[in-house]
Amino acid sequence: MPRKHLIASGINKKQQQQAKIWMKCAKEIKAAAKMGGPNPEANSRLKVAIERALNNNLSRDSIERNINGASKDIDNLKELTYEGYGPNGLAIIVRALTDNEQRTISAIRGYFSKLQGQIAKPNSVSMLFNECGQLLINKETKSLDEWFEILIDQSIIDINEDDKIIEILVKPEDFSTVKLILEKNNADIKSAEIKLIPNDFISLDEYARERLVRFVNACENDDDISWVITNYEEEL
């Protein structure tokens, strides 16, 4: 039986990880509201940030506080995107929100160096991805065929399934409409966000995979980095 201090340590670590995710969601909401205004219907970036925050269980009160506090925020955050390659041609995109560009690029270069990768020219990697609305729903409510029939009049890019989850990919502009249809049909939505989806996936050997895990962990623990995405075939 695990000792109490080990259990407590595991719980505290999970709480810290969740707190960091919420902090990044709040930062993204505040930046989006400051750049494009507080109305999510007129600010698509804010709408996406809110969806991501809700998906990560950030409370609506916290979301509202960050939207309302955006105009009072004195931090001048800059959005930066870095593209690069890792082992075996692994494609990587890193998105950051920072008030110190030099600090952030120095950190990201260090992460790529430890990965034995390199930062690439802008748009040389992003062409390997497509921006899509991704909705993951529990299969227990309806089958793939039933959902396909419900969504047949929508502009669905693709529908896939595994043993437990159905994945629905849509164009970003159709994301809110499809999500609403799913909700009206009592879908058990596990995840709903607009994200970059790789056109193709690659595999890595165990040594390269371990380096990638360390790279992703370093990025996730960096307060300036909003997210990192790759075309590795597994979800880390």
Swiss-Prot record:
Coiled coil: none annotated. The lineage of its organism: Bacteria, Bacillati, Mycoplasmatota, Mycoplasmoidales, Mycoplasmoidaceae. It comes from the Bacteria. InterPro entries: Integrase-like_N, TACO1_YebC-like_2nd/3rd_dom, TACO1_YebC_N, Transcrip_reg_TACO1-like, Transcrip_reg_TACO1-like_dom3, YebC-like. The keyword DNA-binding applies. Belongs to the TACO1 family. GO terms for cellular component: cytosol. Keywords: Cytoplasm, DNA-binding, Transcription, Transcription regulation. This is Probable transcriptional regulatory protein UU295. Its main location: cytoplasm. One of its GO terms (biological process) is regulation of DNA-templated transcription. HAMAP family: Transcrip_reg_TACO1 (MF_00693). It holds the Pfam family TACO1_YebC_N. It comes from Ureaplasma parvum serovar 3 (strain ATCC 700970). It is found in: Cytoplasm. GO terms for molecular function: DNA binding.
